[in-house]
């Protein structure tokens, strides 16, 4: 795996209220349980994280998925695509972008 192979997907989700955010977070944690994460790892997902954006007047979450390569991304999308069926109803606006990694601090950190 070279750094140019690593593929990343980033989504910014905006919620109109704490209630909608809490609803989403509970379902997100249920959907991405240990078994789901094991499946995704087995199919090439390196990591997944969700962070709440600070210092904003609105409620926003940034979700970052990292994959070994584009093929891994495509394999994992079969699972991620089920979110709409399982996630249920909540009000939010999402926008995202995807692409190949061009730089990482891991180039400067030696493995222990």
Task: Report each predicted region and the residues it spans.
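An amphipathic, aromatic/His-enriched active-site/gating alpha helix that lines ligand/cofactor pockets
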Residues: 30-47, 56-57, 64-103, 110
């Amino acid at each position: 795996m070279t750094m140019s192979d690593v593929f990343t997907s980033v989504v910014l989700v905006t919620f109109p209220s704490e209630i909608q955010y809490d609803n989403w977070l509970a379902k997100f944690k249920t959907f991405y349980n240990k078994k789901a994460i094991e499946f995704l790892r087995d199919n090439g997902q390196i990591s997944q994280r969700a962070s709440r954006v600070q210092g904003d007047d609105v409620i926003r979450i940034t979700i970052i998925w990292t994959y070994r390569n584009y093929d891994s991304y495509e394999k994992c999308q079969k699972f991620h695509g089920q979110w709409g069926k399982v996630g249920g109803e909540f009000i939010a606006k999402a926008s995202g972008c995807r692409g190949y990694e061009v730089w990482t601090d891991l180039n400067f950190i030696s493995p222990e």
